[in-house]
Amino acid sequence: MKKLLLITSIVTLGYFSMSGQITSRGPVDLWNWKVELPSGYKASDWKLSNFHNDRFAAPFFYLNEDESALVLEAFPSEGTSTAKYTRNTLREQLQAGSNDVNWTMKEGGVLEVEMEVESMSKGANGQYHRTILLQVDGRTTSKQTKQLGLEKPVSLPMLKIYWQEGYLKVVRKVLKDESTAGDALLSKNSWKEDKNTKHSESKVGFEKVRVRLELKRGKIVLQINDERPIVYRDLSVAQWYFENYFTVGNYLQTKDIGSHSTVNYYKIEVKH
């Protein structure tokens, strides 16, 4: 990505004209996103822009016009998906149709969403299943991949935000050894899941919640509603040299028969 590139990608739940004004006609603007459904079906740019007429999108991905909400349904489905669990996600694409143009911590990124978990199934233990709502994913750049002598980029999530028992739970990657340096920083084996997880102060349950996630060199700030911000500013953040992209959705963490979850998105806005 060019250093001076400025991208603003907005999904406003309503309809857009070519001028960007909300109108009663036209598709939701998802030009800079790629969807992957529980069936394994994927679509981006021009194909995704017509999702409301796409028979593959229903019943997983649709617009609730009465509520002005983009609805993401997740339940186990037969198909070509190779995901471990039940994935229904939107992947940010700075260049429409391409996964190869992303952003670095130096360039930074801000994700703002308003969302609501409408329903969630329970497991045999009586507890609600959980889903990943938001994620910051990392991968090696083309240059880094070549430097490591690999054919495919190394990919791993930097940060995940789960809905778990009605709370938002934040999980991130940290260095196993803070003295790690050089190419070793780009190895999955150098990173582990932080045991010091964070939670929203209040139970969000099945109510609307606002989240603002800002990343820049050496710092991550997460704002949930009007709560005190969750701030990460340590060596693990400073030494994250992967390029990144945002993921938004409903990644249900189970494939149990009869499991399901519904998430409504009222606002998705990305700025770089």
Cite the ranges covered by each PLM segment.
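Secretory/extracellular carbohydrate-interaction modules
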Residues: 53-57, 61-177
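Bacterial Sec-dependent N-terminal signal peptides
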Residues: 1-21
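Short tryptophan-centered beta-strand motifs in secreted/extracellular beta-sheet-rich domains
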Residues: 113, 207-215, 220-222
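Ligand-recognition surfaces built from glycine- and aromatic
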Residues: 22-30, 108-110, 122-126, 202, ...
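N-terminal module-boundary/linker segments of secreted carbohydrate-active enzymes
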Residues: 21-54
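Short strand-turn-strand beta-turns centered on an Asx-Gly dipeptide
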Residues: 224-228
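Surface-exposed coil/turn segments at beta-strand junctions on protein surfaces, enriched
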Residues: 65, 104-106, 202-206, 215
